[in-house]
């Protein structure tokens, strides 16, 4: 199956923090994904875009913060993150080019 536009719309960006760098030692990679993406869609997109085997996908929805600007209450958007576990011996180097 070839990579489609939906695969590119599913995976938005990698999440690069100290915690995700430590997770990379356990064959796990963290991505910011579309809010309507399912675990199966995320696994298919990662397998197709990065040519790796995915064994497990865990998702987290972080609720947007409430912010005030000049007395007007607003809210930031919710963010969905996916922790993707890769098969043994496989890796994705997302820190290249930083």
Swiss-Prot record:
One Gene Ontology CC term in the entry: ribosome
GO biological process, one term: translation
InterPro entries registered for this protein in UniProt: Nucleotide-bd_a/b_plait_sf, Ribosomal_uL23-like, Ribosomal_uL23/eL15/eS24_sf, Ribosomal_uL23_CS
Domain of life: Bacteria
A Pfam family the protein falls into: Ribosomal_L23
GO molecular function, one term: rRNA binding
Role according to the record: One of the early assembly proteins it binds 23S rRNA. One of the proteins that surrounds the polypeptide exit tunnel on the outside of the ribosome. Forms the main docking site for trigger factor binding to the ribosome.
Subunit record text: Part of the 50S ribosomal subunit. Contacts protein L29, and trigger factor when it is bound to the ribosome.
Protein name: Large ribosomal subunit protein uL23
